[in-house]
C-alpha cells in the first residue's frame, strides 16, 4: 500500500494481517474474524468480496496523533457480521486490533481527553455505551438504558450525552388484542408501515442525559410524546444531530409529519433545541425540501447543513447552506459547484468548509472559502471516490475506494 498526498496513511485492506488483540471472544459464542481466503487465478468471486473487511467510522484523538476505526468481518454460513476496533498512529504506523470479541463494537470515539475510547457494544444483551483504554483493556459499561442505544455524541465539555433510541409511537397487535399473545400479524391502517425490510412500530428519538464520567442520569427525550423521527429513517444516524460548541443547544433533523403526509413529503427541517429553556426553533421553515445533517462552526457563529429545494423530489440537488446565528442570514455556499454535496466538515478556523461531491462520475474532496466569495477549490483527483472526513492538524483524513479496492483510510 502506498501513501498519497492528501491521505495520511493507507490502512491495511483487512485481508492483510493486523496487530495484537485484547479481550478475546467469550467461550461458546461464535467469533467472526478476518478471513484467510486465497484468491485463485486472480478471479474476484462473491466469496472473496465477502471475505474483505469493511472499514467503519474514523475518529481522530484529541492530540491528533492517533486514529481509531472499526472493521466489520462477515460470515456467509452464519449470515452475520462482527465489528472490531483498531487504533493506529496518524502517520500510518502502529496499526493494532485492540478488540477481539463477538460483541459488535462500533461507533468508536475518543473521550476524556483521549484517555478512553467510547463505543457501542451488545455485550450486555442490548446496545449500550461502553469505554475502554486505547489499548483495548479496561472495558467498562457506561449506560444501563432500557433499550438499544443506536448512536451517540458527547457534548464538547463531556458532561452530557446525546443519544438515539427507539420509542413506541403506535400500539402493536398484542396491545390491541391481548387475548392473542402469540399473534405475529401486522395491522396496517396508514403509511408509513415499512421501510425496506423493517416494519415501523416506533420512531427514533434524540435523548439528552447528564454524564458524570461513569453513568448517565436525568434523561430527557427532546421529542417526548411526539410521533416524529429524529434522525429520519431509513438511513439517518447521529450525523443528523449536532451539539453547539457551548454545549447548551442541540440541532436536530426532523420531518414533523405522520401518515400519508409523511410518506409523500421530503420536507424535513433543522430544529435547534435549547437545553435550558426547552424551547425549539425551526431555522429552515421556509425551505420545502430536505434539510439535513446540521453542523455548528467551531466558533459557534454559524451552522451549516445540506438542503434540497423542492418537496417530494428525493433526487433534487443537495446543496450546502450556512446560516449566521446572530443575524439569521442564510447562504447557498456550494452554488459554484453545480452538483451534489454528499458530506461536509468545518475547518477549524470556521472560515472554510471541506466537502465531498460528485463530478463527472468521481467523488472528490473540495474546499469552499467562505471569506473569498465562497470560492471552491478541488483538493483531490483521480479515478477514486472519497467518503468520510476528519481533521488531524493540517491534514484531512478520508476514506477512499475505487473499482479495484474497497474503502481505505
Question: Where do the protein language model's features map onto the residues?
Answer:
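Predominantly five- to eight-bladed beta-propeller fold
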Residues: 25-32, 83, 166-225, 253-256, ...
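Short glycine/acidic-enriched loop and turn motifs that connect beta-strands
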Residues: 73-77, 123-126, 168-171, 257-260, ...
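Hydrophobic beta-strand positions that form the internal "hydrophobic ladder"
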Residues: 64-67, 114-118, 161-162, 247-250, ...
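Residue-level detector of Asp-centered blade-edge/turn motifs that repeat once per structural unit
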Residues: 62-63, 112-113, 156-157, 245-246, ...
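Multi-bladed beta-propeller domains
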Residues: 31-54, 80, 88-104, 121, ...
Amino acid at each position: 500500500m502506498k501513501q498519497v498526498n492528501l491521505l495520511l496513511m493507507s490502512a491495511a485492506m483487512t485481508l492483510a494481517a493486523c496487530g495484537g488483540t485484547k479481550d478475546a471472544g467469550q467461550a461458546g459464542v461464535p467469533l467472526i474474524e478476518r478471513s484467510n481466503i486465497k484468491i485463485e487465478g486472480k478471479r474476484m468471486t462473491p466469496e472473496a468480496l465477502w471475505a474483505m473487511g469493511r472499514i467503519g467510522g474514523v475518529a481522530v484523538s484529541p492530540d491528533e496523533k492517533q486514529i481509531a476505526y472499526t472493521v466489520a468481518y462477515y460470515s456467509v454460513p452464519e449470515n452475520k457480521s462482527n465489528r472490531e476496533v483498531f487504533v493506529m498512529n496518524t502517520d500510518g504506523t502502529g496499526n493494532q486490533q485492540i478488540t477481539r470479541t463477538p460483541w459488535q463494537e462500533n461507533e468508536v470515539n475518543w473521550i476524556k481527553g483521549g484517555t478512553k475510547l467510547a463505543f457501542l457494544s451488545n455485550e450486555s444483551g442490548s446496545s449500550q455505551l461502553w469505554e475502554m483504554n486505547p489499548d483495548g483493556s479496561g472495558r467498562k459499561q457506561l449506560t444501563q438504558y432500557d433499550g438499544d442505544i443506536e448512536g451517540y455524541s458527547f457534548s464538547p465539555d463531556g458532561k452530557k450525552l446525546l443519544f438515539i433510541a427507539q420509542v413506541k409511537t403506535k400500539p402493536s397487535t398484542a396491545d390491541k388484542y391481548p387475548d392473542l399473545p402469540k399473534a405475529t400479524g401486522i395491522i396496517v391502517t396508514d403509511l408509513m408501515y415499512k421501510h425496506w425490510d423493517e416494519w415501523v412500530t416506533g420512531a427514533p428519538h434524540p435523548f439528552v442525559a447528564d454524564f458524570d464520567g461513569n453513568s448517565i442520569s436525568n434523561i430527557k427525550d427532546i421529542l417526548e410524546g411526539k410521533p416524529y423521527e429524529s434522525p429520519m429513517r431509513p438511513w439517518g444516524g447521529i450525523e443528523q444531530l449536532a451539539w453547539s460548541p457551548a454545549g447548551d443547544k442541540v440541532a436536530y433533523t426532523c420531518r414533523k409529519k405522520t401518515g400519508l403526509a409523511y410518506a409523500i413529503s421530503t420536507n424535513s427541517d433543522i430544529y435547534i433545541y435549547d437545553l435550558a429553556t426547552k424551547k425549539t426553533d425551526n431555522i429552515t421553515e421556509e425551505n420545502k425540501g430536505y434539510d439535513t445533517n446540521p453542523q455548528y462552526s467551531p466558533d459557534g457563529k454559524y451552522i451549516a447543513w445540506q438542503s434540497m429545494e423542492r418537496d417530494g423530489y428525493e433526487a433534487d440537488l443537495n446543496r450546502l447552506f450556512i446560516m449566521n446565528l446572530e443575524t439569521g442570514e442564510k447562504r447557498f455556499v456550494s452554488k459554484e459547484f453545480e452538483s451534489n454535496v454528499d458530506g461536509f466538515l468545518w475547518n477549524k478556523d470556521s472560515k472554510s468548509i471541506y466537502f465531498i461531491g460528485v463530478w463527472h462520475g468521481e467523488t472528490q474532496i473540495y474546499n469552499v472559502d467562505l471569506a473569498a466569495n465562497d470560492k471552491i477549490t478541488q483538493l483531490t483527483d483521480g479515478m477514486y471516490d472519497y467518503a468520510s472526513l476528519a481533521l488531524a492538524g493540517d491534514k484531512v483524513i478520508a476514506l477512499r475506494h475505487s473499482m479495484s479496492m474497497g474503502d481505505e483510510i
